Structure formats: structure tokens, C-alpha cells
């Protein structure tokens, strides 16, 4: 018998939750669905957040306990995230690309992968790769 799983929600360990919220909200259109209490008096200094867009959920978590973090991200840690890719099903890959470019987000030119998916990629502030893809020719 299988386990009746209904969904999966990635949790990304990030350097600065408010900075990541701003990226996913402003660049991609996610809404903040839930947050932890702020770590400090700054009302947006959350350690955890749940984001939603069209039924897609994504969690962000501060990679440092009690918001004690260095002044700059650890570049080795950011580089280690480069092998993590989140794939989003997106019918209009060209439209997503145009929207990202218009918002000043560096995105790869859409192309069809050898396995038939049209894709464009971006990298978030913590080095995680995001792919927007759809089967080529099936819009």
C-alpha cells in the first residue's frame, strides 16, 4: 500500500528571509501565506515563510539560528545551492522569460531541452536555480 501523499512543498534554506520573500513576491508573483514571528523588532524580519502562487507552495527558512548571521552570504554555501533546481510548470515560457527580463531578472534564453521541454532558468538570491518549463509545442 502506498502512502496517500497529496503534495510536496520544498523548503529552501536562505540567508535572509525578507530578501527572499521580496524576490519571490516581486519577481515571480508569489504571495506570503504564512510566516513565523519576527526575530527582531523589524516587523518583516521573519525566520520562516510559506509562499503561494496558483496552488504552488514554497517555504523559506533562515539558515542561521535566531537570526544570527554573518554580514554577507557565505559564497561557498551559495555555490553549493547551484545543484538544486526547482522546476515550475509554466505554459507560457516565452512570456515568463519576457516578464523576468522586464523586471531586471537575468534569465536564460528559452530553449528546448533534449527531452522536449521548453525551458528558461533564473537563479534566486541564494543560488537556487528555478526553471520554468512546458512540453515544447503543446501550448
Which residues fall in each region the model found?
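N-terminal beta-strand motif that seeds the catalytic metal site of vicinal oxygen chelate
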Residues: 1-22, 83-86, 135-139
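Core segments of cupin and vicinal oxygen chelate
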Residues: 11-58
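Vicinal oxygen chelate
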Residues: 16-18, 79-126
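Short beta->alpha transition motifs characteristic of CBS
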Residues: 34, 121, 133-139
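Short, P/G- and charge-enriched loop/turn segments at secondary-structure junctions
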Residues: 36-38, 71-77
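Active-site beta-strand termini and strand-to-loop segments that position acidic
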Residues: 50-54, 122-125, 135
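A short acidic/small-residue loop/turn micro-motif
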Residues: 66, 114-115, 135-139
Amino acid at each position: 500500500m502506498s502512502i496517500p501523499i497529496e503534495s510536496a512543498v520544498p523548503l529552501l534554506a536562505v540567508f535572509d528571509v525578507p530578501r527572499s520573500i521580496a524576490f519571490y513576491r516581486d519577481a515571480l508573483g508569489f504571495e506570503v501565506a504564512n510566516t513565523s514571528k519576527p526575530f527582531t523588532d523589524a516587523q518583516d524580519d521573519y525566520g520562516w515563510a510559506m509562499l503561494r502562487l496558483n496552488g504552488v507552495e514554497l517555504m523559506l527558512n533562515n539558515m542561521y539560528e535566531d537570526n544570527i548571521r554573518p554580514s554577507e552570504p557565505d559564497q561557498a554555501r551559495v555555490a553549493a545551492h547551484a545543484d538544486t533546481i526547482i522546476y515550475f510548470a509554466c505554459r507560457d515560457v516565452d512570456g515568463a522569460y519576457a516578464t523576468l527580463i522586464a523586471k531586471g531578472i537575468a534569465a536564460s534564453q528559452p530553449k528546448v531541452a533534449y527531452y522536449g521541454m521548453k525551458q528558461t532558468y533564473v537563479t534566486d538570491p541564494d543560488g537556487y536555480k528555478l526553471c520554468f518549463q512546458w512540453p515544447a509545442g503543446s501550448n
